[in-house]
Every structure is written in structure tokens, then in C-alpha cells.
Amino acid sequence: MSIAIIFTNKSPDTWVETLKKHLPETEVEVYPDIKNFNEIDFALCWKPENGILAKFPNLKVIHSVGAAVDHITKTQKIKETQTICSFVDENLSNDMFEFLLASILNQIKNLSVYQSQKKHQNWQTQTYKTFKDITVSILGVGNIGAFVAEKLAALGFKIKGWALNKKEIAGVSTFAGDKELSQFLNGTDILINILPVTPQTENIINNHMLSQVNEGGYFINVGRGEHLVEEDLIAVLNSGHLSGALLDVFKTEPLPTEHPLWNHPKIMITPHIASITNIESAAFLVVENYQNHLNGLPLKHTLSLTKGY
């Protein structure tokens, strides 16, 4: 059997080279140049086109090259005989932590304000805050979220974490479910979203939620664009309740040039770069899962189709 690489808007070349290096006896093919669709039982995917996996009748394992799998589950009909695997790697988690720490520091030390003042040659000091002054609340404390929460707590931030189900994380006050959401939001200075996309979490970040963050608070979205009601964020920012937001993910990517988010003075935009898969690190997991698949052994980091993560 062979491995198929099925990517949209991502070059497969380095992946092909890396997999061939680690699996020299395995044929690695790139869609649409597949010799025999019946021979493919393992696919490496990034944003596969709508319904495309149905072309592979013997496909057993669908492996994401990112931590999220919604880019697969939203466009494909997954069979009960198929297993979806996500990519979990400490490098990915650490990259996310570093990005979020930089984003928090930019906000509490007023670096963007000073950059704006520089344009007008305005020499004016701003009041800053320290780590111990700030409560950071994290929506989504799975593998990456829990890693980030522990790291930030170790630096002295007051950290809260929320998930659909209760989690225990060292140094973190944790909350779960709808009943504890308001308690989780109470006292929040910086709200960070790292949730997976599920029917329960789509549009969860709305006017009602953002209005419960402390006045002058800040919002960072590194989860998915589907979590955020963009119009509500703009309204809360315009009201003055929130001081700003940093958005790394969007419902439509790339973000359309005419989108109002581009021109909002209180919104910082980054092009989905908070943490990027390291191919060498990812290859070890893919190779291990492929070999486990061939040998009938359990696969790592499989998706629960009922939970969606």
C-alpha cells in the first residue's frame, strides 16, 4: 500500500522528501497524481478539497499535518472504518506559548502604543502592568492550551482555564461547561482562545462573552475563525469596553482585502502563524503512526468523532 499526500495551498515537496527518507520502501504519491486510488490506505492531509477522500475506497488512516482536524472533518465524510490522527508536538506547543507571551507583553507594556506615538514624535509615558497584575483566561486547555497555561502560570500570571470537560492543571484555576463559563470570565484581563472547532464551540465568542471580560481587557484568537462572531468583536471594541484584539485566525483565509477587520485601529492581524508545523518533528509522528498502522498497533493522537477533537 502507499501513502498519499493531499494538500491545498501548501507545497508537498519537503514532505515527500522527508517521508521517502524515513520510509524508503514506501511509495509516497501526491494528489492528483495518484497511480492507483485503490492502493492508498494512509493519507496525509491539509485542507483537502470537498469530498475528495471518497475517491480512495481503501483509505484507513487520515493524518492531519496540523494540530487541528476541522480542516478535514468539515469537508469530508468520514467512515466508521477510518481513523483521523492529529499532530501533537511539544515544539508546536512551545511556539504557541512564545507567540502568546510576546502578544501579552506587547499589550501590557504598551509597545504598540509607543510605535503609534513614534509616528507623531510624541514622547509620552504609559502606565504598564506586570505579570502578577494580570489575569489571563484561556478558552481551551487541551494539549496545547494546558502547556501554555502551565508556562504562563510559572511566570507569575494568574491563569484560568476553561474546557467543555473538567481538567486539572498545576497552578491553573480550571472551569468546565456552560454553567462555569461566567465564573471563568469574571476578572479576566486577557482572554485567549485555543479551542478546537466543534458544533458546541462555533460562534462561542460573541458579544455576551466579550462583554464579561474586564473593561479595558484584551482578546487574542489563536483557535479558529469559526469561534468568533466578528461583528460582535468590532461592536465591543467600538464601545470602548475592550482596548484591543489580536487575531491570528479567520473564517476566511487569507482574509479578504475588503474585510473591515483590516482597517480597525484596535485590531492587530497576523496571518495564521502563531505556531507552524515543523516538518521534521511531524514526520517522526507520521512515520510512527504509519508503521503502527501496518503492524496493527494503536495509533497516536486519534480523533473522537463524537467530540470532534
Residue ranges and their predicted role:
Residues 1-40:
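N-terminal glycine-/charge-rich "phosphate-binding" loop or analogous flexible N-terminal tail
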Residues 28-39, 50-53, 172-187:
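Short acidic low-complexity segments
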Residues 41-115:
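Phosphate/diphosphate ligand-binding glycine-rich loop within oxidoreductases
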Residues 44-45, 64, 192-193, 221, ...:
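Redox-cofactor binding/interface segments in oxidoreductases and associated redox assembly factors
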Residues 114-147:
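Glycine-rich NAD(P)-binding loop of Rossmann-like domains
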Residues 155-171:
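NAD(P)-binding Rossmann-fold cofactor-contacting core
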